[in-house]
Regions:
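Short, acidic, metal-binding catalytic loop of nucleotide-sugar glycosyltransferases
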Residues: 23-32
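Glycine-rich, basic loop-to-helix element that forms the pyrophosphate-binding segment
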Residues: 67-84
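Short aromatic/hydrophobic "clamp" motif used to bind/position activated sugar donors
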Residues: 89
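Conserved donor NDP-sugar-binding/catalytic core segment of glycosyltransferases
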Residues: 101-135
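Catalytic beta-strand/loop signature of glycosyltransferases that borders the donor
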Residues: 122, 204-211
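A recurrent flexible, glycine/aromatic-enriched loop bordering the glycosyltransferase active site
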Residues: 148-170
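Acidic donor-binding loop at a coil-to-helix junction in glycosyltransferase catalytic cores
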Residues: 186-193
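Catalytic core of nucleotide-sugar-dependent glycosyltransferases
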Residues: 210, 214-217, 223-250
Length: 251
């Protein structure tokens, strides 16, 4: 059975969100191989997690302070992957939740499709109140949307950018060998990563089951704070930059 590490990047304590995130991981039908909370130097956050009752996850959970001092999302994920010991990893943003079948689905699909380097979930997008907004990533299962049904390819990514990799399950070796996430990509790091994988002919597959609930455009999130400061021209700049960045595996 595949070993899947769950990484939770968290830079500050927002108790009302983080409890839901942790409990959703505790409720997995298949227990993750390990759970890593990658934290900042926020004392309140680290004290809270240190006292949390992780229940059935207690023996596999570690709280790791990011010693680099870089707490942006990409750096937190990269640090967590470097510290992980599983063959595969996934991540959950601390204000999101995963469905009880997510790790189970991951294990089953890794066993069935060992050639795939990146598995994406179908993402259930909600607002801050939990109200449904839309699904993301499900379009690759529509007839003639992509070159192969269920797979995300380069030609499709050139035409469509709005895919979400939250909750993706990735082969750790593939991730590290190909440069991880780029911290210099402030807005389109999701798109750049998927595009880079496709250019390197690393298979990307969407698991055709709901796996991840994402709180979209939450007030106070790092992504929304940054996005609110840019205009249309800068947004276009980041998309074009993502299309050029795949030539390089490191910043």
């Amino acid at each position: 059975m595949a070993n899947i590490t769950v990484i939770v990047p968290v830079h500050k304590l927002e108790q009302n969100y983080i409890v839901g995130c942790i409990e959703s991981i505790k409720n997995q039908k298949v227990k993750p191989f390990e759970v890593l909370f990658v934290t900042s130097d926020d004392k309140e956050l680290n004290d809270y997690l240190g006292k949390y009752d992780f229940g059935n996850l207690k023996g596999v959970t570690k709280i790791i302070k990011n010693e680099t001092g870089n707490y942006d999302f990409q750096s937190q994920i990269n640090y967590g992957v470097e510290q992980s010991t599983g063959d595969y990893f996934t991540f959950v943003e601390y204000d999101d939740e995963v469905s009880p079948i997510w790790i189970k689905n991951g294990v089953e699909y890794i066993d069935a499709y060992p050639e795939v380097g990146v598995f994406l979930p179908i993402v259930y997008e909600t607002d801050e109140n939990g109200k449904f907004i839309s699904f993301t990533n499900e379009s690759v299962w529509a007839k003639e949307f992509s070159e192969e049904i269920g797979r995300l390819d380069n030609n499709t990514l050139q035409k469509v950018q709005n895919f979400n990799f939250d909750g993706m399950i990735v082969n750790k070796e593939t991730f590290l060998e190909n440069g991880g996430l780029k911290s210099n990509m402030k807005l389109t790091f999701t798109y750049e990563f998927l595009l880079r994988m496709s250019y390197k002919s690393i298979p990307i597959m969407v698991i055709p089951k709901l796996g991840y609930k994402h709180t979209n455009n939450r007030e106070g999130s790092l992504f929304v704070e940054y996005k609110s400061t840019i205009d249309v021209l800068e947004s276009k700049f980041w998309v074009n930059k993502a299309k050029k960045e795949y030539f390089f595996t490191e910043d």
